From Swiss-Prot:
Domain LRRCT: 107-146
TM spans (from-to): none
Keywords: Coiled coil, Leucine-rich repeat, Repeat
Chain coiled-coil ranges: 600-680
Record organism: Homo sapiens
LRR repeats: 51-72, 73-94
Protein name in UniProt: Leucine-rich repeat-containing protein 36
Composition-biased stretches (Basic and acidic residues): 241-255
UniProt keyword annotation of Cell cycle present: no
One family name in Pfam for this protein: LRR_9
Location of the region described as Disordered in the Swiss-Prot/TrEMBL record: 241-270, 702-734
InterPro entries: CEP72-like, Leu-rich_rpt, LRR_dom_sf
């Protein structure tokens, strides 16, 4: 274990090979950690390095940046692969006014705080590059928008930490709820080795019921620190949250074998706490993982940092996917396992288990059902989602592994085929009779699940091999044929039943099932496997490189499908020709019915095509008209007005109309007034003329008062020559004016005596 140092100025001189240089003259310094020792804290070591511009503290165990504020000229700071725990430590870099480049990758703060990058960009305004990525202007705006509501208050960091903790707690609660849903639905977790394409299902019931597994011999005490023997990324992350932050050797990137592949589930394994870790055969002999895991096929499943369960899944060169029955506890795991993989013992001697493997101590299960077991094909059919591209990809990878590892040796394959054919020919009714409704009632249960017994491993093998087909369609097709057979030929009483091989042999005579004999298929299988291995060697580029390689997946799928649906050959002689004839007749009737429906469909499609073409023509004409109208409007300079503009203009015109209406009313009143004035003027003129005429008619010696007494003047005023009483009634002003004029005339006339 590397030593942990608290840095001081003397340590800086020793590590940086500074002998006679003054601290003020140092501009660049590299203090990377090594296996000899790692820096734990910096303290006041940089108090005198005022002109330091570049500092490299990568690959250390620094947990606090207290004391970094003395580097007032620092521009480039590398804290790669340290143990900076929180944003509070990142905020200690704020007093550095010239900091332009910062590297905090592989620190806990990067994994735990989702807003870490935004916080760093918001806090360090002069930052130009963060974690070897240029800080974009959009990130600055996003950070400012995200943290603007907190402002520059004193509780800024507390509020940021609080929001981060709330997000973490929310994720934990979501993880617990999802874990409970998984256990309630009795769904299996699937972990896949990216090197092998191996599916390993974990039934939740067995995981929940199992208490613990004894520790392997020779690996020390159970309370040994997890940092010495890492069990995988997820185990270390769980342990990091629960153990003190100064235990830094347990980091997921430290002491990690380059040949060890750690596989993550498509879902977030952080919430569930399950992890599968595989170790390659070529790992270093001095690595501690080899002492803990002596066999390459042991995986560790962890739900807690202190609890692990080891399951032996057999030799990696011959293992194929297998699922424990949902009702079988882990106490019967060895028996089920030995029954399923019993054929491996006949093909080649399986290496004995290491003494490090201990027996399981688990609670007994009261409802054990050992009469049925699920094959890999059933498992993949039930667990993989056909609508998901990821599920199809993983299923293809699993089938690839099963085919390459089980059929990789042509000589072994020939031996297996011969044994299978012999076992099918020698199959007798001693296995027991099965009612017809046992198969017809449940088509999803394959026929092989009704014939499993501890002494018939070959029989299980033929059906297990058939279930390993990479095409779920082909698998269901064969099972449906088995279920639709006339079961009276295969399941009768022990006295009059025929061998099952005759029923299976009749399958080759059915329409669409042209599987050649085993002796004819063997060279084809060997050729396909050889081509598949060459394809793997061609495209292999490290762990998991084949899972998303389309150049590999396409040809591999075609090769595997050629095993399931081989080239048609001459059909075998069937033992039941009447069944074959019935099948052909049914097929012929179906084809005739389909042929009758085809013309009707063609007519309807033609009619639809005609309607679509007509609609297309109409729409094209409308588009042409619209284009012409738009061109004309552009040429004439007319600009289309929007609805808002038209509404605004309408309001303006309405106001103008109202104003004009008011002005019109005023003009009408003015016209009435002018008409009244004109009438008054005419009355005055007439009255004046009449009075002048009267004055001219009167004798000179006659008195004016006698000539025009008030009564007479009043009478004259009432009897106008025009028949209007203008002086007396309609115009008082004119009446007074007339009197004034008459009086003036009388005054101006000379007296007769004078």
């Amino acid at each position: 274990m590397a030593e942990q140092w608290e840095l001081d100025e003397e340590g800086i001189r020793r590590l940086g090979a500074l002998t006679l240089e003054q601290p003020e003259l140092v501009e660049s310094l590299s203090l990377q950690g090594s296996y000899a020792g790692k820096i734990h804290s910096i303290g006041d070591a940089f108090r005198n390095f005022k002109n330091l511009r570049s500092l490299d503290l990568s690959r250390n165990l620094i947990t606090s940046l207290k004391g970094i504020q003395y580097l007032c000229s620092l521009q480039d700071l590398n804290l790669y692969y340290n143990n900076i725990p929180s944003l509070v430590e990142v905020s200690r870099l704020q007093p550095l006014p010239f900091l332009k480049e910062l590297d905090l990758r592989l620190n806990p703060v990067v994994r735990k705080d989702t807003d870490y990058r935004l916080f760093a960009v918001y806090t360090l305004q002069t930052l130009e590059k963060l974690d070897d990525r240029t800080v974009r202007e959009g990130e600055r705006k996003a950070a400012k928008l995200h943290f603007s509501q907190l402002g520059n208050s004193e509780n800024f960091l507390l509020e940021v930490e609080k929001s981060s903790r709330e997000k973490t707690m929310k994720n934990c609660v979501t993880g617990e709820s999802s874990a409970s849903k998984v256990s309630a639905n009795v769904d299996s977790r699937i972990e896949m080795d990216s090197n092998k394409g191996l599916f390993i299902p974990f039934p939740n019931r067995e995981i929940k019921d199992s208490l613990s597994t004894s520790a392997t011999q020779g690996n020390g005490t159970r309370d040994q620190k997890l940092d010495t023997f890492p069990l995988g990324t997820q185990t270390q992350e769980v342990a990091r949250r629960e153990m003190p932050s100064d235990n830094h050797q347990e980091d997921e990137f430290r002491h990690y074998s380059p040949r060890q592949s750690t596989v993550r589930s498509p879902e977030k394994m952080t919430r569930e706490g399950y992890q599968v870790s595989f170790l390659d055969n070529k790992s270093s002999g001095s690595s501690p993982e080899k002492e803990l895991i002596p066999k390459p096929d042991t995986f560790h499943l962890t739900h807690d940092a202190s609890l692990s369960k080891c399951l032996d899944v057999g030799d990696s060169s011959q293992i194929h996917p297998y699922q424990l029955p949902s009702d079988v506890g882990l106490e019967n795991y060895d028996s089920c396992y030995s029954q399923t993989l019993s054929l491996h013992g006949s093909l080649g001697k399986r290496p004995q288990r290491s003494k490090n493997y201990q027996e399981y101590s688990i609670k007994p299960s009261n409802d054990i059902k050992t009469t049925a077991s699920h094959s890999c094909g059933d498992l993949l059919t039930s667990l993989s989602n056909p609508d998901s591209s990821t599920g199809r990809l993983l299923k293809l990878s699993s089938d690839l592994y099963a085919t390459t590892h089980f059929n990789s040796d042509p000589a072994v394959l020939v031996n297996v085929e011969q044994q299978l054919s012999t076992s099918l020919d020698d199959l007798t009714p001693a296995h027991g009779s099965v009612p017809n409704n046992a198969v017809l009632g449940n088509r999803t249960t394959p026929l092989r699940t009704l014939l499993l017994s501890p002494g018939t491993s070959e029989h299980r093998k033929i059906f297990t091999k058939r279930s390993l087909s990479p095409s779920k369609r082909g698998f269901k097709w064969k099972d449906n044929i088995l279920a639709n057979l006339n079961l009276k030929h295969g399941f009768q009483d022990a006295t009059g039943s025929e061998p099952l091989s005759s029923d299976l042999g009749s399958l080759h005579g059915l329409a669409g099932n042209h599987s050649p004999p085993i002796s004819a298929r063997t060279p084809h299988v060997a050729t396909v496997l050889r081509q598949l291995l060459e394809l793997v060697d061609k495209h292999w580029n490290g762990s998991g490189s084949l899972l998303l390689n389309k150049k590999f997946l396409g040809p591999a799928r075609d090769l595997l499908l050629s095993l399931v649906v081989p080239a048609p050959s001459q059909p075998r002689c069937c033992s039941h020709p009447e069944d074959t004839m019935k099948a052909f007749c049914r097929r012929e009737l179906e084809l005739k019915e389909a042929a009758q429906l085809v013309p009707n469909d063609m007519e309807s499609l033609k009619q639809k095509l005609v309607r679509v073409l007509e609609e297309n023509l109409i729409l094209s004409e409308k588009i042409q008209q619209l284009e012409e109208g738009a061109a004309i409007s552009i040429v004439s300079g007319q600009q289309s007005h929007t609805y808002d503009d038209l509404l605004h203009k309408n309001q303006q015109l309405t106001m103008q109309v109202a104003c004009l209406n008011q002005e019109l009313a005023q003009l009408k009143k003015l016209e009435k007034t002018v008409a009244i004035l004109h009438e008054s003027q005419r009355s005055l003129v007439v009255t004046n003329e009449y009075l002048l005429q009267q004055l001219n008619k009167e004798p000179k010696g006659y008195s004016g008062k006698a000539l025009l007494p008030p009564e007479k003047g009043h009478h004259l005023g009432r009897s106008s020559p025009f028949g209007k009483s203008t002086l007396s009634s309609s115009s008082p002003v004119a009446h007074e004016t007339g009197q004034y004029l008459i009086q003036s005339v009388l005054d101006a006339a000379p007296e007769p005596g004078l």
